[in-house]
């Protein structure tokens, strides 16, 4: 787990997210508290639970991005799910425990990727040897299933080759490393999942269908088949196969479970949509309240059964978010409110924020569009006045229509650059400066016709 200080975490988040300093400080403290907890003796460590957070603010102000960047920064398993996808136990739909199973899958993939990186050098060497075995099969008869490197019988594979064979093998090794054999086709043996029965699950019951399919799949052994591919593709397949042999999946599952339990982050979006309000009524409110009650034990701490073993949720950090346009946090049932003790309100964005979003982040929209058009050898640049005009229009359209936050910049930039994107292949080698007049010209029809702007922007 990352041991960055709160100030360093906020500094890293500032590279991608503009403003929202209160929210950044709160999540930075929450992340630092996880590191602090790991430094405590076990008997006290187990008593300290994470302080879950509710983020309130309109769409497009950075709620999801803050949580996503935080998880990436800390190297933690992170899963985002909309609270509206869940249904009360007993109804058709996803149960709330499915998000813990999804988080565990992400943890497995994260740890497996790290373990594969550790054995990468050894796997590449084994894959290269296996490739040369295919290109230069030995004269001795092969055992069944010996289409490539077999670590179970190294003494048989390492019989003393003749000088000519060694020389030829090294020549082929050199040619392979220089890329001279990339277009050549070879036949390799690959594993094929044993034939099972495909279970078609009902909408909302995909988790059950996947578990049944997985269970049936294990009843059928994997089969081997020969496949003809280019050498470069064969090398990638062999690396994957050799890595799988070198990795202990039981150890991966154990490490992943530990990481999920101690450092996992579950992001519950649209939490306001399951809050009961006075406008609706009847069965709708009852159903929403049922989902909230199902969330209680998971957020408080329980044990969820996954195909990799039991996962405790006691120390998973839950971050929930919602616009709360038609509901308030107090509309959540009191028990759930108590399990999210920290609350922070994210502010709406104005033209100054939009300008900073266009210029400051490492992945700013202007940087992205420049890079895209440079692939066609078309160089574009934006004047300061042009970006100020874009920011002003973003604020204006958000005020006059629906406020969708920074996402408004996507629609405006697409409208401004649509002609250049279409003509880019024909304007290879050109350099264009986009100024204020160009922006005004491209947006003229939608700025003058308010009804049209509702549909276009």
UniProtKB/Swiss-Prot annotation:
Compartments it resides in: Cytoplasm
Main localization (coarse): cytoplasm
Superkingdom assignment: Bacteria
Entry GO MF terms: ATP binding; ATP hydrolysis activity; peptidase activity; proteasome-activating activity
GO process terms (BP): protein unfolding; proteolysis involved in protein catabolic process
Sequence positions that bind ATP: 18, 60-65, 269, 335, 407
Keyword annotations: ATP-binding, Chaperone, Cytoplasm, Nucleotide-binding, Stress response
Region Disordered, annotated ranges: 142-171
Signal peptide: none
Single GO cellular component term: HslUV protease complex
SUPFAM superfamilies xref list: P-loop containing nucleoside triphosphate hydrolases
Oligomeric and partner information: A double ring-shaped homohexamer of HslV is capped on each side by a ring-shaped HslU homohexamer. The assembly of the HslU/HslV complex is dependent on binding of ATP.
Family assignment from sequence similarity: Belongs to the ClpX chaperone family. HslU subfamily.
Record-given protein name: ATP-dependent protease ATPase subunit HslU
Organism: Maridesulfovibrio salexigens (strain ATCC 14822 / DSM 2638 / NCIMB 8403 / VKM B-1763) (Desulfovibrio salexigens)
